[in-house]
Amino acid sequence: MGTAAEVRMVLYEDDSVQVNYADGSTLQLSPCGSEFLFEKAPPPSTHPLEQPERIRQRTHFVISNYREQLQRALDFRNSSATCPFLSESIIPSERKKRVFIDFSEVEWPSPDRDDCITYSESGIVKITSLDGHAYLCLPRSQHEFTVHFLCKVSQKPDSSVMPPETKNRVPKEELVGKTRNVCRSGRLSGQRLRNKENEPPRQLLTSKNASANIHCVSETEGREELPSPGTKRRYVHVWVKQSWSAASCPEEWKYPLSLGLRFYNKVPAASAADAEVPVSGIVTSDNPEERGTGVSVLPRALLLSCSAPHMHRWNFCDSLLQRQSDAEEYSYPELIKVVWYKGVTYRLTHKNVNSIEIFPGDGSVFKSEGTHFGNYFTYSSQDNSGKREEKTYSVNNLPPDRPGNLYSVRSLIKQATRILQHCAKIRLSLSHNYRVCCWRMAPGVNVSSILPVLLKESLIPGVGRFLAYSDDKVHAVFLDGVTLTLNWDLSSSAEKTQVDQGLRLRWCRLTFPDGQDQLIQTEHPGVYERYVTSVVTWCRRLTQTSSRHVSPRLSPVPEENWSVASELEKIQKFNWLLENSGVLNLTSGKKNEQCSSDHCKPGSSETLPEATNEESVSVALKRTSEVLQDIDYLLSLTRK
């Protein structure tokens, strides 16, 4: 069975994957990677209302018809995923490696070591870990880098009952004690020095408190003893390749990346081509944040089976007619992490604002810039001689395509703009469940603790209802049926609100009564200015009020308890207000006058307290019923 070529591959923030093929078929991977859904392309003679054929299987038990496509989809997922999924049954044997130890971290060389940093003729710096279990490659452009590391294959759930700390520990019978010098700090336990035989000590510092006082103590270190064949268990590991942007480097790769960047900063491009370049001249930075740590904790592979398969969400069209009418390219309700489209890679970050980087594949990069997302794109490239070229493109004034160019700048930027617009809609939607996925749900974790809570709710007469959530999302419902959603940093100080520092995303989402929505720039709202101004003013007032309190954040609004006790508490408050308002005194005076005129016997009311209470309750209920009927009548008139 021939396999069609991939046209678009999308990796979302929850590590789910969607692949579109040239023949119209699609493949979707669950966030954990343990399950996939393949939707075949319908033949041309298919009725428009006929549903396409779908195959849903476990990844570990994939049949041969979809093995090749699934392998490429998993490689794309693992290249930028937080935790890889490595099924031993579908991984080629040349990528597997059997070792006698189960390790979870690697140690990188100090900057004064020149035997672990190499420079190739193609202009790539390679930094190898001391144990050889990982290495990082940084090209001359320094825009992106690749890292290769050994990772243990995915295990069955029953073999992963032990905690990670216990599983990563080598058994005592496999260890032979030897003495080592450990460099410790009185303030920082992560600082240490490791010694191997006949090697000088290497100081490995974490990213914080690098100037802490250091003293060395003697300790027993485990040394791995080579087991005899057939007596010790061998662990299957797989070489995993990941690609990252240098501007948004994960924490575990910051230290080796800093070594590669210092190599280019200290060694000129002309002398870097020389194979005899001394790397020992590279010194560490005085800034501990830039230095990072010398030990990287490797990503761990997910389990073969998912513990929450009910959370797998599949996106597909029910018919060919719906597929043709749906023009949305990215319809999955999740933020996008990486897009591969016709050989071009798009990488996104969602820290404070949505930003995107375009890697055409020739060593150059396009980066989104500007106050609003994607208003401008900066182009940067570097040739073999080290000469850099930079340009700036405006989204509203893109250059025409030129014959002979490797790619169309107009097409690349337009595609990036569509991706950014999708991410803006997701960030401005009220579907808060996009933060929850199956592999993040550890046993015993409450989903409600992950979802945002309501912080503030206000009902403004004549305007509408305003709500603020803990994920910095503000939602407003106006009286005319229009709803507005924007992101506002509720922890921003009142002094900065005049420049709208609290406005995290310079866009807002308007939803009209007919269900249509539209993205509006908050600084240029046009005819929707009154909606945007009302919400921004309310957010400013909210941050000013919260800044006067001791707590930097607003406290969550407690949920109403619709129990009998709460209702009785409301009745008691109502009675207290009624007694202190003077209404009861007025009615009691009228009753006394009526009793005196009718020559009532004194003490008659006291002799029958139960009858009086029952009568007063019945009268109150009757009046309440009449008031409710009047309210219902008025509401029915307004509806007409």
From Swiss-Prot:
Region of interest: Disordered: 594-614
Pfam family, any one: Polo_box_4
Name the record gives this protein: Uncharacterized protein C5orf34 homolog
Organism: Rattus norvegicus (Rat)
Phylogenetic lineage: Eukaryota, Metazoa, Chordata, Craniata, Vertebrata
